[in-house]
Amino acid sequence: VKTYLENDELNEKYPVYPFALRSQDGNATLTGQINYPETPAGVYPLVMLAPGSGMHDRHYLIGDSGTQADFVFSCLAQDFLAAGLAVLRFDCRGVKGNLRDNTLDSPEYLFNRELAYRQMFIDAAVRQTVTPQSQYEDLYTLYRYASELPHIDRHNLILLGHSEGTINIGRMVARYPVAAKALMLVSPVFSSMKHVLEWQLIHRTIAWLKAIPHTGDRLTLEDLKNGFGRSPLAFLQPISSLLPYKGYWDEADFDSMTARLQASFDTQRDMVLSHDDREPWPADAPFTQSSYAWWKQWYQNDQPEIEHLARCQSRVVCYFGMMDTQLNAAAEAAWFEGVKHRFPHIDITLLPDVGHTLGLHGLLGPMTESCAELLVRTAHDIVTAR
């Protein structure tokens, strides 16, 4: 198994240049770092890493293995650096650390680690300024900074986004003059934010129950037991929450489940949309993650995100994990087939047996070695191509 350098060791091996930039809206200081493959001399291609939803620092802790490989961006950075690319990583605004910080190992935080983390490492007032606009503006501030650095080859920049990071990259390139050589989008949203949330809250459980192998129009308890482990459902909820107490699920059950979930979604949507954009979501400090403006877009924005890439001058390389629990990857890919004549610059790759972070888990990392290798090889080919 490949071993990765600890976050500090990485900076000892690959020269690190920290930065602190004022955000465009003046509400935040954007912190992060660039590592170079060696002491910089001449210019280097650069890959800039943009994380998905949530409150992340530059290391992007999104794995569940308890190892260094859980820091998905630290590990990708190491692989890119070894391949000769410089790497920019940043902290989301208002985030000053991650849940594995050893300050939190103190016995007093044994039962409230999460709360202590929020109080020590999250600036709730700054998080309340997170909006759809701030997300892509911050990316542009970072992109502009990187493209003007003396040791960065501005004609050889790759923007790599994961999940919501792909949305923010798309929105940025649609609005600003961005001359990236390529966009690499991992688990991108081609459809709309609202479509994704409806899939998660209404349709996915039933779609995946129906996909479990069974005969006729009944899914029996036996079918469920036999097929559950191979279904993405296994990553979402225990089998005990899906037991058919009459011995089977049938079409009428699925219909009433859907109706119930749809009604619950509608109620939730009305509640969410009744809040002012500037209010803290989901609650006041220390629980603030963003403004309500950020959360509301998931209930009302039905513009297909792929449209932001329509006039993009860069090559766009996309990766979907077919065991993804967050996106309906097969449907996103099928939908792309219908519009791809308008997007000749976009390529998609479907990866079997991996999830949202291209790992074994349906949602979380670590990323598999073969997927990480694929990303690094692709990036290397892009920046070395004439």
Each PLM stretch: what is its role?
Residues 347, 352-386:
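Catalytic active-site module of serine/aspartate enzymes centered on a nucleophile-bearing elbow/loop
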Residues 312, 318-320:
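Short beta-strand/loop motif that positions the catalytic acidic residue
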Residues 152-163:
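Alpha/beta-hydrolase fold nucleophile elbow
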Residues 101-125, 129-132, 136, 186-308:
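Accessory cap/linker subdomain of secreted extracellular hydrolases
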Residues 2-42:
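N-terminal cap/lid segment of alpha/beta-hydrolase-fold proteins
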Residues 39-80:
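Short, surface-exposed "cap/lid" segments of acyl-processing enzymes
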Residues 70-100, 108, 112-119:
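Conserved alpha/beta-hydrolase
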